[in-house]
Amino acid sequence: MKAFIRRFASNAAKAKQATSRKKLLDKMTVEEMPASSRKFPWVNFKMDREPGKIVLEVKNATIDGGDGIVCKDLTFSLGNQDKVALVGEFDTLKTAFFQLIAEEIKSPEGVLKWGNTISYNYFPKNNDAYFKTDLSLVDWLRQYSKEQDETFIRGFLGRMLFTGEEALKSANVLSGGEKVRCMLSKMMLSNANCLLLDEPTAHLDLEAITALNNGLKAFPGPVIFCSQDHEFVQTIANRVLELTPNGVVDRSITFDEWLETKKTKKK
């Protein structure tokens, strides 16, 4: 409970829950606190090969976030040690950025080139299209696996707490959080050497966020991600890329350092 309060007190979406739990905690004695029965998922990303020095190059691209929100002259390169936090006021612009580099949409101008050694895996913000099927979770995940053995597939589902009969439930009845956990199983299964994640923490509980946080910190390859969870971003990112309608601000700093620069500019 203390971990939840500490992590989400400043999170707009979960601040009320954090406040409520703090009030409950303040009223409880140590003897009254129940033993936790919560289980933690296990997130462990492995790479099929080491990424080359240059992972991705984007030059003079344009992304359209809708409603007249456009970012022009998008130019940056991604190195094999970069863990980039994508930030900015407009969520639609960030999603368009991910769709561009995941090659789901194209820029009307400019160049986008992935390195020859790179295999990337993309976690989209909206994953509903992946689950419009009545396949069991075992068969759903089997679609994305070279290894078809059920025990092997169940191992990746089990990491995200889909064990026993849970692994046989239909993919089209999952909650938002369950869909995210399945997508993370799929991402782990890919063995990609570059990970792209658009708001992966949005529907996760504290245990799953912590597991993903640890998994991305330990991952030796490049990552581009965005999240509303402050601790998640601060402990993973070594570079911040800010998207604005006026262009891109690219800084090799931590998230907290970036926040300080924003405060300084406002003074």
Task: Describe the residue ranges of each PLM region.
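ABC ATP-binding cassette signature C-motif
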Residues: 45-267
